[in-house]
Amino acid sequence: MNLESLSSFMELSKNFRHKSVLEKRQEIKSFLELSYKDFFYNNANEDFLFNMIENYIGYLSFPIGIVKNLKINGKYYSLPIATEESSVVAALNFAAKILENADLRYSLGEVLGISQIYIKSEKDLSKIFVDLGDKIKTWIEPLLTNMNQRGGGFRRLSTRHIKELGIQKLNIYVDTCDAMGANLLNSIAERVAEFIFLEFGYECVLKVLSNDISEFTAKARFVLDFKHLLPGKEDSWNLAKKIELISSIGFYEEERAVTNNKGIMNGITGVCLATFNDTRALEASVHKFASKSGKYFPLSKFYTTDNALVGEIEIPLQVGTKGGVISFNEASILSFKIMNVNSKSEFIGILSCVGLASNFAALRALAFNGIQKGHMRLHVNKILHLLKTKYNISDFEKDKLLLEMERMNIYSFDFAFKILKKIRLENENKV
């Protein structure tokens, strides 16, 4: 399918949430001009999966939900989120409505991949290696034909001597265009290591990519007028001040910062799972960046001006929109079609905004009426579904269970099952 033939965004209907699963699929299919035969998350190509990993025995199903009409840089996006956590998609949809008038925007500079070679040397070779740029570019040219054609390729190098280990580190920075480029970066490291040995006789003890891209970050920001936070002006100001205070706690308490950043990654990791991006590399780099000062800090901050709540985030995002499994897996291909993303830089920007929106939704809930109210409503739905499937509960029993869970403020399957047994025992005694 030609993505350029799509309109600038896929604006889903206002009542999308209330449609059946089949109706939701049909609406998206009609936007994407997919036929009834086209893949839509509800099956798997096991032949493909078999060849992805060793000892394949099956696949794990994750629910995929849609965040609809999140306005980013003036354009609306519908985003697929793969997650097991009940409230992630609901919270992001809620945030999308509020932030529609907040001018949510991202900005980013270059994003480069890094090949690393660690060379055994008691001597500091920095002066020699810093002048190797042209030679290294020639050495790796055969590997970069496709990247050069797309405007990418070798960009620069850096080096430093680790005296304590007797090791010289060499970093090679490469623009991998729309790919994450893991295989390419590893190949470059191995090729350069071979030439260093042949040219200089130095043993290379390690040659591999780095998953740390903390020097290449995306920034996102919104400015939300108080009037869009809550209906009442005074209430909105108070809520914004609470959000500001909760946000600041993470800068003094690492325990809070960890939880704050987990909330940011809820949305980001969900989109990356839906697109078959490497979530381990992504999160490793993000958390390293959060601790770059020697202390673990929040990736985001929220503060107030005279009439608005401002949210900001800075985050490194190592992802791709092409290459590897991404280009061949049907689920990944469909996810990118739904988003109508045209480049890796656009995808990185979207992810930074998704992280900020996820964080905003969580902080607003914490400041307003606690995180459990919305989350538990969805969690209870799961419990009731399981009870319906296993024990065929009636509508009467369902209502009684809901009342009792709310009264006791206990939302667990074990507690619900205990109450169900009590209800049924009471009914038996009445008969």
Curated annotation (Swiss-Prot):
Top-level taxon of origin: Bacteria
Name the pathway it acts in.
Answer: Metabolic intermediate metabolism; (R)-mevalonate degradation; (S)-3-hydroxy-3-methylglutaryl-CoA from (R)-mevalonate: step 1/1
What does UniProt list as catalytic? Answer: 85, 278, 375
Which key words are in the record? Answer: NAD, Oxidoreductase
| Enzyme Commission number | 1.1.1.88
PANTHER family, from UniProt?
Answer: 3-HYDROXY-3-METHYLGLUTARYL-COENZYME A REDUCTASE
Report the protein's function. Converts HMG-CoA to mevalonate.
The molecule here is called: Probable 3-hydroxy-3-methylglutaryl-coenzyme A reductase
**Organism source for this protein?**
Borreliella burgdorferi (strain ATCC 35210 / DSM 4680 / CIP 102532 / B31) (Borrelia burgdorferi)
UniProt lineage: Bacteria, Pseudomonadati, Spirochaetota, Spirochaetia, Spirochaetales
